[in-house]
């Protein structure tokens, strides 16, 4: 038999080679297997795992040792205030993507009935985070992957979010209307031959890679979005840390104004905001 304390220590040691947060990973796996909170793990470290629990835990650890992200093993990832279902059909939501949500909530009029579009919604993270905070707004989300849309719809249903609609297709072309107050997106932006892709091999490549310069999807969105925004509407795009200057040039060439670069807590350029002229 193995206690929670012993299991946490053993797993943490095993995962040091594949994880920057081995102890947290160990605790999350134990939470999942034992169906207990982290507070319970700390409060009752002497509790013993039965043979079935040990077998399941061992299988999870083996998957993690092969580099599979903890979110896929658990089948869920927290984003904003939401616990979202995730599978290898969708990109794992990142904390830095919350910048898109924060900007929208802070800068658009709270009490008006606005229409927002989310392009390449994946798990629905951005669309659902905005929808849950602004239940009187209408959010239309698109994705070219039917499998991803299925996950997004499951997440919407799980959180009883009624003001978010999902559409299958490429970027803006899948949208049902052309009068959005803001369009947001976290499109693929990694160059096809970037070595970083190897570290992300478990996630859907089509949600990560975008041509030789990583800008193929962003170029399409910048050009298309003008026709789907109201005059003065906003376009927000997450991008790679070294792409800001090129994206700003693309936006200027397409007639956008009030173009600003937003940086993350590390001071890296992460998001471009622009307004339709």
Swiss-Prot record:
InterPro entries: DNA_methylase_N6_adenine_CS, HemK-like, N5-glutamine_MTase, PrmC_N, RF_methyltr_PrmC, SAM-dependent_MTases_sf, Small_mtfrase_dom. It catalyses: L-glutaminyl-[peptide chain release factor] + S-adenosyl-L-methionine = N(5)-methyl-L-glutaminyl-[peptide chain release factor] + S-adenosyl-L-homocysteine + H(+). Substrate binds at residues 186-189. S-adenosyl-L-methionine binds at residues 120-124, 143, 171, 186. CDD domains: AdoMet_MTases. GO terms for biological process: methylation; translational termination. GO terms for molecular function: nucleic acid binding; protein-(glutamine-N5) methyltransferase activity; protein-glutamine N-methyltransferase activity. Keywords: Methyltransferase, S-adenosyl-L-methionine, Transferase. Its EC number is 2.1.1.297. HAMAP family: RF_methyltr_PrmC. Methylates the class 1 translation termination release factors RF1/PrfA and RF2/PrfB on the glutamine residue of the universally conserved GGQ motif. Belongs to the protein N5-glutamine methyltransferase family. PrmC subfamily. This is Release factor glutamine methyltransferase.
């Amino acid at each position: 038999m193995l206690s929670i304390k012993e299991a946490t220590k053993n797993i943490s040691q095993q995962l040091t080679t594949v994880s920057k947060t081995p102890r947290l990973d160990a605790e999350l796996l134990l939470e999942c297997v034992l169906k207990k909170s982290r507070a319970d793990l700390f409060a009752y470290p002497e509790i013993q795992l039965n043979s079935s629990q040990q077998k399941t835990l061992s299988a999870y650890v083996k998957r993690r040792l092969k580099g599979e992200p903890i979110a896929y093993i658990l089948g869920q990832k927290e984003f904003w205030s939401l616990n979202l279902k995730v599978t290898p059909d969708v990109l794992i939501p990142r904390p830095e993507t919350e910048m898109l949500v924060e900007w929208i909530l802070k800068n658009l009029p709270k009490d008006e009935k606005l229409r927002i579009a989310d392009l390449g919604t994946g798990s629905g993270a951005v669309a659902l985070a905005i929808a849950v905070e602004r239940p009187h707004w209408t959010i239309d989300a698109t994705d070219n992957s039917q499998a991803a849309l299925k996950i997004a719809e499951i997440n919407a249903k799980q959180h009883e979010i009624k003001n978010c609609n999902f559409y299958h297709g490429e970027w803006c072309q899948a949208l049902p209307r052309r009068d959005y107050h803001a369009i947001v997106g976290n499109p693929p932006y990694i160059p096809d031959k970037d070595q970083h892709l190897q570290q992300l091999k478990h996630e859907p490549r089509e949600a990560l890679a975008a041509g030789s310069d990583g800008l193929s999807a962003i170029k399409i969105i910048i050009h298309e979005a003008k026709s789907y925004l109201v005059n003065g509407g906003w376009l927000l795009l997450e991008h790679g840390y070294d792409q800001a200057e090129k994206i700003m040039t693309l936006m200027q060439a397409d007639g956008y104004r009030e173009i600003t670069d937003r940086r993350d807590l590390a001071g890296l350029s992460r998001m471009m905001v622009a307004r339709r002229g």
